[in-house]
C-alpha cells in the first residue's frame, strides 16, 4: 500500500485495480471539504468525473439496488468507471468487495444494525 499526498491531503492507496483510496488525516482533512470541493479535487487530481456520498443511517439500503428519496444508503454497488463513492466510518466497518469477472464494485458501511439486518448477504445476492 502506498501513501499519496496531494495539496496537503493524505490518502492510502489500498488497490490499483480497481483504484481504492482511503482518506487519512493530513495537514488538511478531505472529509472537511464540501461536496462540490471534494468532487472538484477528485476530478482535478485523480481524473474522476463523479463523486457520491450518502446519508448513512445504519440500515441495509444499497445505491444501485434500492431507491431512497432522502439519499439514505449504507452502501453502493456499481460497474461505473471513474466514479468515486464515500463510505464514512467511525466505529463501523468499511467493507469493499470487487468482482473481477463482472467488474462489479461494492462498498458497504457495516454497523451492527446493518450487519444484523443482512447488508452483506444482500450485496452478495446481487453478485449471483
Placement of each model-derived feature along the sequence:
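Active-site microenvironment for binding and transforming phosphate-containing groups
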Residues: 1-128
Amino acid at each position: 500500500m502506498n501513501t499519496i499526498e496531494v495539496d496537503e491531503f493524505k490518502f492510502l492507496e489500498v488497490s490499483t485495480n480497481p483504484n481504492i483510496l482511503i482518506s487519512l488525516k493530513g495537514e488538511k482533512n478531505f472529509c472537511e471539504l464540501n461536496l462540490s470541493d471534494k468532487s472538484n479535487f477528485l476530478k482535478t487530481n485523480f481524473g474522476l468525473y463523479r463523486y457520491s456520498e450518502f446519508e448513512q443511517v445504519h440500515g441495509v439500503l444499497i445505491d444501485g439496488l434500492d431507491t431512497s428519496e432522502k439519499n439514505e444508503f449504507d452502501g453502493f454497488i456499481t460497474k461505473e468507471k471513474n466514479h468515486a463513492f464515500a463510505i464514512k466510518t467511525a466505529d463501523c466497518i468499511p467493507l469493499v468487495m470487487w468482482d473481477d469477472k463482472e467488474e462489479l464494485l461494492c462498498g458497504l458501511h457495516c454497523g451492527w444494525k446493518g450487519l444484523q439486518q443482512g447488508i452483506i448477504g444482500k450485496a452478495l445476492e446481487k453478485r449471483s
